[in-house]
């Protein structure tokens, strides 16, 4: 699991996706702090990482990223965590 606080390339996202799901990577975004956690099997693991690092629960959203997909289908908004 890693916290991302700056731009990340699609190539790096593709590499991270191989750790669990191959074509998809789970993430949790802190919309207030403008950071996200990536690279875990479960959104709840990423949520916990962000909470332990100062995020507030009400600011967290779960997402799925599909690095090899273009356009709107690149990101899937999963839920408010």
Predicted regions and their residues:
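Metal- and O2-centered redox machinery and metal/ROS homeostasis
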Residues: 5-6, 19, 58, 66-67, ...
């Amino acid at each position: 699991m890693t916290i991302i606080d700056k731009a990340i390339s699609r190539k790096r996202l593709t590499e991270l996706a191989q750790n669990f799901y191959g074509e998809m990577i789970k993430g949790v975004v802190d919309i207030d702090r403008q950071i996200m956690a990536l690279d875990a099997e479960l959104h709840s693991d990423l949520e916990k990482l962000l909470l332990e690092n100062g995020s507030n629960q009400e600011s967290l959203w779960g997402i799925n990223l599909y690095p090899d997909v273009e356009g709107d289908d690149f990101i899937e908004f999963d839920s408010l965590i």
